Amino acid sequence: MNVSKYVAIFFFVFIQLISVGKVFANADEWMTTFRENIAQTWQQPEHYDLYIPAITWHARFAYDKEKTDRYNERPWGGGFGQSRWDEKGNWHGLYAMAFKDSWNKWEPIAGYGWESTWRPLADENFHLGLGFTAGVTARDNWNYIPLPVLLPLASVGYGPATFQMTYIPGTYNNGNVYFAWMRFQF
């Protein structure tokens, strides 16, 4: 191997190491922002929220019919939270909710949610949101062992009433569930 190939390999490795350092620096910055948003939402809420589960739907393409025929798709339960809107108009919320799962067993969930919010109409009360939730849940079929969750969020709302939803990904006959609820801000 000639010297120019060694120099090229050295610079390639060196550039990769520099890039990794920048990625970790950005990850630290992102985590700091995440923690600060949670703390601010906890310490300075603008609203208190009531959560009412509305629907669970098991994607028919991902389940055997005999399974979906037995599943509960009408969850009932409720929850409470507190939330705020940041200077960019984005929503931040802390919540705790319990609902009847697919097997009609209680499933608690608690966490933090964030949505980037758009107000596409002249009426500022109408809003759309897209974001994520990070939290902890527990299920009967897992002996109520706390399980971390990181899921997408989407919403459509008018004023203090918001229809919020997520999708739980999965494999065949497991996961692939659309879950939605109403959130009322006070």
Curated annotation (Swiss-Prot):
Keywords, ordered alphabetically: Acyltransferase, Cell outer membrane, Membrane, Signal, Transferase
Transmembrane segments: none
Catalytic residues (UniProt): 58, 101-102
Reactions performed catalytically: lipid A (E. coli) + a 1-hexadecanoyl-2-acyl-sn-glycero-3-phosphocholine = hepta-acyl lipid A (E. coli) + a 2-acyl-sn-glycero-3-phosphocholine; lipid IIA + a 1-hexadecanoyl-2-acyl-sn-glycero-3-phosphocholine = lipid IIB + a 2-acyl-sn-glycero-3-phosphocholine; lipid IVA (E. coli) + a 1-hexadecanoyl-2-acyl-sn-glycero-3-phosphocholine = lipid IVB (E. coli) + a 2-acyl-sn-glycero-3-phosphocholine
Annotated site residues (Role in lipopolysaccharide recognition) in this chain: 67
Site feature Role in the phospholipid gating, where: 172
Enzyme class: transferase
Molecular function in Gene Ontology: O-palmitoyltransferase activity
Ribonucleoprotein listed as a keyword: no
EC number: 2.3.1.251
Compartment list: Cell outer membrane
Signal peptide span: 1-25
GO BP terms, alphabetized: lipid A biosynthetic process
Domain of life: Bacteria
Keyword Magnesium: no
InterPro entries: LipidA_acyl_PagP (IPR009746), OMP/PagP_b-brl (IPR011250)
Stored HAMAP family: PagP_transferase
Function: Transfers a palmitate residue from the sn-1 position of a phospholipid to the N-linked hydroxymyristate on the proximal unit of lipid A or its precursors.
NCBIfam families: PRK11045.1 (NF008271)
Family under the similarity heading: Belongs to the lipid A palmitoyltransferase family.
Protein name in UniProt: Lipid A palmitoyltransferase PagP
Source organism of the structure: Escherichia coli O6:H1 (strain CFT073 / ATCC 700928 / UPEC)
